[in-house]
A protein has these predicted regions:
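A short acidic (Asp/Glu
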Residues: 51-53, 76-80, 192-195
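Glycine-enriched catalytic-core subsegment of oxygenase/oxidase enzymes
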Residues: 159-162, 167-205
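Conserved acidic residues
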Residues: 37, 150, 178-180
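Glycine/Thr-rich phosphate-binding loops of Rossmann-like dinucleotide-binding domains
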Residues: 5-8, 75, 190-192
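Dinucleotide-binding/catalytic capping subdomain of oxidoreductase cores
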Residues: 56-163
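Glycine-rich dinucleotide-binding loop and its adjacent helix/turn
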Residues: 1-59, 65-66, 203-204
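Short loop/turn segments at strand-loop or loop-helix junctions that form parts
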Residues: 1-2, 69-70, 184-186
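Short, well-structured alpha-helical interface segments that form or flank functional binding sites
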Residues: 46, 50, 137, 141, ...
Length: 205
């Protein structure tokens, strides 16, 4: 498939940082977790979600996890995507629910509302309306775990990181003591220049 991958380990972050900041990518957090009191997870997508869940599963207190989310996302309910007999009615029912929601919607916003009402989509916080959908999938138990995090920083994209603060475009946020910053901000898949599927002797899938 003609697409480009973009993960924290192999790309330069879209923000700058001071040299004395304790910093790692999601790919290497297992090797660097020891010796810190707080963990600042930068990135609100699936990688950020999985990193927060991994920290919780490894007995880090929710109070010591600080999740920087530039934009909240609509999330797919995992039970609707399981190819197992136990989830047959959930998965097939979700397909019907999606078609019904799309057919009955009067706008894009209304469509997302209807998909949420039917249990197809989930969100982290009922008080915060998501503004993106990249297809990230979570279970209802994972969602409940994420909802135990009291410190979710919603100030847009990080511009610069120093030991004492995160700099955003319009504000700053004070860093907790002895914190490890975990970069989960890569977009995973990026768009490339459009190409014709059939071009002479070349086929681009």
């Amino acid at each position: 498939t003609y697409i480009n991958t973009n993960i924290p380990l192999t790309r330069t972050p879209c923000f700058t940082r001071d040299n004395d900041v304790a910093f790692t990518s999601a790919n290497t957090v297992v090797e660097n977790i020891e010796g810190f009191d707080n963990y600042v997870v930068v990135g609100g997508g699936k990688t950020g979600i999985d990193t927060c869940l991994w920290l919780l599963e490894n007995h880090v207190s929710p109070n010591n996890i600080h999740w920087v989310v530039s934009r909240d996302a609509w999330l797919l309910n995992r039970k609707n995507t399981q190819p197992l007999d136990d989830f047959f009615f959930d998965s097939i029912g979700a397909q019907a629910n999606q078609m019904e929601a799309i057919a009955a919607s009067t706008s894009i916003e209304d469509m997302f509302d209807k998909l949420e009402e039917r249990g197809v989509l989930l969100r982290i916080d009922k008080e915060v309306r998501p503004s993106m959908f990249h297809g990230a999938t979570v279970s209802e138990l994972e969602l409940k775990a994420l909802q135990t995090l009291p410190s979710i920083v919603r100030e847009g994209r990080v511009k610069h990181i120093s030991r004492d603060k995160l700099q955003f475009e319009n504000t700053t946020w004070s860093m907790p003591d002895n914190a490890l910053v975990i970069d989960c901000s890569a977009s995973a898949l990026t768009n490339l220049e459009m190409k014709a599927v059939f071009d002479g002797d070349t086929i681009t899938p």
